[in-house]
Amino acid sequence: MKILIFIIASFMLIGVECKEGYPMGRDGCKISCVINNNFCKVECQAKWRQSDGYCYFWGLSCYCTNLPEDAQVWDSSTNKCGG
């Protein structure tokens, strides 16, 4: 019985983390939004079917969750927006 509890606790501690990030438009910039979660959800699901999305208020940009590991998202270190 102790082993079963240990195994279940181990699985709970491991967890499953998915990639998250800002989706990019064709210009390489983040997709803008103003408190419209539904718009962002549609944008995220158009690129990645199983993802979810919401409008990140402080950044005024869409933010996607539950992305596949190979998803290309906006990154400040490789930002090519506007150039």
UniProtKB/Swiss-Prot annotation:
SMART domains: Knot1
Disulfide bonds: 29-81, 33-55, 40-62, 44-64
Keywords for this protein: Disulfide bond, Ion channel impairing toxin, Neurotoxin, Secreted, Signal, Toxin, Voltage-gated sodium channel impairing toxin
Residue ranges constituting the LCN-type CS-alpha/beta domain according to the UniProt record: 19-82
Major subcellular site: secreted
Superkingdom in the source lineage: Eukaryota
Signal peptide (residue range): 1-18
Pfam family, one: Toxin_3
A molecular function (GO) term: sodium channel regulator activity
Tissue expression as described in the entry: Expressed by the venom gland.
Protein location: Secreted
GO CC term (a single one): extracellular region
Function: Beta toxins bind voltage-independently at site-4 of sodium channels (Nav) and shift the voltage of activation toward more negative potentials thereby affecting sodium channel activation and promoting spontaneous and repetitive firing. This toxin is lethal to insects (A.domestica). It is not toxic to mice and does not affect mammal F11 sodium channels.
Record text about domains: Has the structural arrangement of an alpha-helix connected to antiparallel beta-sheets by disulfide bonds (CS-alpha/beta).
Protein's name according to its UniProt entry: Putative beta-neurotoxin RjAa12f
Source organism per UniProt: Rhopalurus junceus
